[in-house]
């Protein structure tokens, strides 16, 4: 079975994914907090410790336009350990792009490999040249969509802190919580 970015349990040697980390008593507290932080970051914050980006808004299913119900996609949580970060235990939520039918361009323009090679060659061939890179935090989360997309997440995948703060028991339908994606 293939998996993306599982977390290694050093004691057992097993690779664990998000749902396994939440069920394992040894890992549950740490990774539940990481999951709450990610959902809070995507929404309107959580517990005063994480600011939200207003990327998603939890909604009632009936708020989804009828003609868009067929486009509701899923969310996948990816766990990883990034030892170089201040908070190394990371959960990232990704939407199932195979179910999104967004009418506008969703591509990310990038430079051609040949252009990059020419550019780097120019840098290393120039005396006293300097080179820098930058990482833009939450770059994609801050790009507004012209029309919202919709998704759903299993209630069992949502940490209690998020469920309580956003009153998701009131919005859940048959074990699912729906959300609107604005960015």
Q: Language-model segments: which ranges?
A:
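Long, low-complexity, charge-biased intrinsically disordered regions
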Residues: 1-183
């Amino acid at each position: 079975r293939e998996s993306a970015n599982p977390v290694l349990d050093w004691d057992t040697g097993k690779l664990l994914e998000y749902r396994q980390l939440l069920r394992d008593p040894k890992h549950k507290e740490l990774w539940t907090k990481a999951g709450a932080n990610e959902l809070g970051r995507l929404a309107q914050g959580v517990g005063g410790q994480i600011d939200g980006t207003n990327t998603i808004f939890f909604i009632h299913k009936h708020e989804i336009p009828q003609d868009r119900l067929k486009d509701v996609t899923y969310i996948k949580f990816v766990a990883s350990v990034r030892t170089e970060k201040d908070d190394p235990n990371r959960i990232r939520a990704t939407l199932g792009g195979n179910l999104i039918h967004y009418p506008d361009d969703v591509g990310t323009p990038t430079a051609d490999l040949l252009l990059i090679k020419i550019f780097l060659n120019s840098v290393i061939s120039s005396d006293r040249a300097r080179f820098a890179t930058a990482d833009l935090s939450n770059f994609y989360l801050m790009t507004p969509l012209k029309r919202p997309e919709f998704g759903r997440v299993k209630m069992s995948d949502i940490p209690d802190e998020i469920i309580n703060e956003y009153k998701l028991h009131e919005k859940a339908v048959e074990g699912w919580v729906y959300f609107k994606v604005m960015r």
